[in-house]
Amino acid sequence: MDLDHIITSKQLSRADIETVLDRAAEIDADPSAFADRYENTVLGLLFFEPSTRTKMSFDTAMKRLGGDIVDMGSVDSSSVKKGETLADTVRVIEGYADALVLRHPNQGAAQMASEFVDVPLLNAGDGAGHHPTQTLLDLYTIRENAGLEDLTIGIMGDLKYGRTVHSLSRALTNFDVDQHFISPESLQLPRDVVYDLEQESGTRVREHDSFEDVLPELDILYVTRIQRERFPDENEYQKVAGEYQLTATHLEAAKDDLTIMHPLPRVDEIAPEIDDTDHAAYFEQAHNGVPVRMALLDLVLSADGGVDDE
């Protein structure tokens, strides 16, 4: 794996993905073997948007590797409030850190920022663009529950603005899976994502406006929330809010071994009654963020002159 920055899942080959997932499995099996590998190594966290799981799991991952973090904190308490540009911010903070993690509301921000720094930069979400590290933990969760071959996967919810969807759907083209996309017409996959899937990867894009008909076929159902904060018009959000609500009754038509995933946070798209069923994997999915991000940091930092891979 030879990547200076992790910006989109399109960068990642099947071999790259398997390298990260295999390393994550090693960490899961024996975390102590990776403790203190990166003593005196510092990870810079630059989050221009709210985050719970991504930010805390990167923080935990770096500390469990023996390193530490520097955190820009909220935008309101940083020099961004004074008008500092993103380019200047990352140039300054790379002087304090050995790698950077960036979340930003603007699509393309991570790519732009990476052009101004020499340390590795990992995209933790750029608006409605990409979220490649979430994709890696999603793939790890899928592999742990169902393998990554000969699967039928449904992806449901906000497919237009959902960066987790854009990244995951592209990464899945590296594996033998059928993908079904379930959304209101107004929230269908962006045409550039459809182009990547169909024209560049040869993936058939199957679009549905209801999940009931396709549910019995699915091995994995990946649910996303309707993202209120991405809508330019509140009235447009209200038209689709609550469009899909998965309940235990729906699961009577599903396969016994269906795995239900969600990048979280959820609103009302998965009923709490599903949480304690064998289908629910979304909390496991969130917890997988730590070993997967430990694996990614280990591989990126070692490639950048840290600990050599054995």
UniProtKB/Swiss-Prot annotation:
Give the residues the record marks as binding carbamoyl phosphate.
Answer: R53, T54, R103, H131, Q134, L264, P265
Q: Per UniProt, where does L-aspartate bind?
A: K82, R163, R225
The UniProt GO MF terms for this protein read: amino acid binding; aspartate carbamoyltransferase activity
**Domain of life of the organism encoding this protein:** Archaea
Keyword field contains Transit peptide: no
What pathway or pathways are given for this protein in its record? Pyrimidine metabolism; UMP biosynthesis via de novo pathway; (S)-dihydroorotate from bicarbonate: step 2/3
**Xref: PROSITE patterns:** CARBAMOYLTRANSFERASE
Pfam families per UniProt: OTCace (PF00185), OTCace_N (PF02729)
One GO term under biological process is:
glutamine metabolic process
Print the keywords alphabetically: Plasmid, Pyrimidine biosynthesis, Transferase
EC number(s): the record gives: 2.1.3.2
Q: Which reaction does it catalyse?
A: carbamoyl phosphate + L-aspartate = N-carbamoyl-L-aspartate + phosphate + H(+)
One GO CC term of this entry?
Answer: cytoplasm
Q: What job does the chain carry out?
A: Catalyzes the condensation of carbamoyl phosphate and aspartate to form carbamoyl aspartate and inorganic phosphate, the committed step in the de novo pyrimidine nucleotide biosynthesis pathway.
Its quaternary organisation is: Heterooligomer of catalytic and regulatory chains.
What family does the Swiss-Prot or TrEMBL record give for this protein? Belongs to the aspartate/ornithine carbamoyltransferase superfamily. ATCase family.
Task: Enumerate the PANTHER family for this protein.
Answer: ASPARTATE CARBAMOYLTRANSFERASE, ORNITHINE CARBAMOYLTRANSFERASE, MITOCHONDRIAL
Q: What is this protein called?
A: Aspartate carbamoyltransferase catalytic subunit
UniProt organism field: Halobacterium salinarum (strain ATCC 700922 / JCM 11081 / NRC-1) (Halobacterium halobium)
Source gene?
pyrB
